[in-house]
Amino acid sequence: MSAGGDFGNPLRKFKLVFLGEQSVGKTSLITRFMYDSFDNTYQATIGIDFLSKTMYLEDRTVRLQLWDTAGQERFRSLIPSYIRDSTVAVVVYDITNVNSFQQTTKWIDDVRTERGSDVIIMLVGNKTDLADKRQVSIEEGERKAKELNVMFIETSAKAGYNVKQLFRRVAAALPGMESTQDRSREDMIDIKLEKPQEQPVNEGGCSC
């Protein structure tokens, strides 16, 4: 059902696929966004998980479909089909693991192979709460994002740092948003997250 700001238009749905190596925090970022919580017990995602969240923006309501992919090699063959019809690819690395950062180039290449330029890509350096173990500087992250022409942000799913800002920036760039290239408007978007009213739909047998 549309909010008043939608002017009678149907609720628009956008697919976000989360990509990256195992244990970089993809599931934790989604959990923090959905429920504002963090689970200290690590459990690998099996296959693909699916959750959705309604976001109330300043002038419209959108439905984000969040697809959480497994980082393990044995599930890699599943991922291209989920990238294929995505609007946004969120490519995550662990700032304490330089290999996970290096592998983001491959993930971004995979996205562009499937989607060409018709996709929003956000590079995310997660786990800033472990700054004393940092192996990848924020400058290195910014440099790679600039070289690959993607968006960039650092986050901490554990501390909740910049997680809402991550989704604000993605929302500002969604198709149909005015001035999608005007980064100065990103902080002006007011996002209200609904409380989960129903059991989220999961695929893949893991809700971690």
From Swiss-Prot:
The modification Cysteine methyl ester is found at residue 208. Its main location: Golgi. It comes from the Eukaryota. One of its GO terms (cellular component) is endosome to plasma membrane transport vesicle. GTP binds at residues 23-28, 39-40, 42, 45, 71, 126-127, 129, 156-158. Prenylated. Regulated by guanine nucleotide exchange factors (GEFs) which promote the exchange of bound GDP for free GTP. Regulated by GTPase activating proteins (GAPs) which increase the GTP hydrolysis activity. Inhibited by GDP dissociation inhibitors (GDIs). Switch 1, switch 2 and the interswitch regions are characteristic of Rab GTPases and mediate the interactions with Rab downstream effectors. The switch regions undergo conformational changes upon nucleotide binding which drives interaction with specific sets of effector proteins, with most effectors only binding to GTP-bound Rab. This is Ras-related protein Rab-6A. The small GTPases Rab are key regulators of intracellular membrane trafficking, from the formation of transport vesicles to their fusion with membranes. Rabs cycle between an inactive GDP-bound form and an active GTP-bound form that is able to recruit to membranes different sets of downstream effectors directly responsible for vesicle formation, movement, tethering and fusion. RAB6A acts as a regulator of COPI-independent retrograde transport from the Golgi apparatus towards the endoplasmic reticulum (ER). Has a low GTPase activity. Recruits VPS13B to the Golgi membrane. The modification N-acetylserine is found at residue 2. PROSITE patterns: RAB. A lipid is attached at residues 206, 208 (S-geranylgeranyl cysteine). Coiled coil: none annotated. NCBIfam families: small_GTP. The gene is Rab6a. Interacts with BICDL1; leads to its accumulation in the pericentrosomal region. Interacts with SCYL1BP1. Interacts with VSP52. Interacts with RABGAP1. Interacts with GCC2 (via its GRIP domain). Interacts with RAB6IP1 (via its RUN 1 domain). Interacts with TMF1. Interacts with CIMAP3. Interacts (GTP-bound) with APBA1/MINT1 isoform 3, also called Mint1_826, but not with isoform 1. Interacts with RIC1; the interaction is direct with a preference for RAB6A-GDP. Interacts with RGP1; the interaction is direct with a preference for RAB6A-GDP. It catalyses: GTP + H2O = GDP + phosphate + H(+). It comes from Mus musculus.
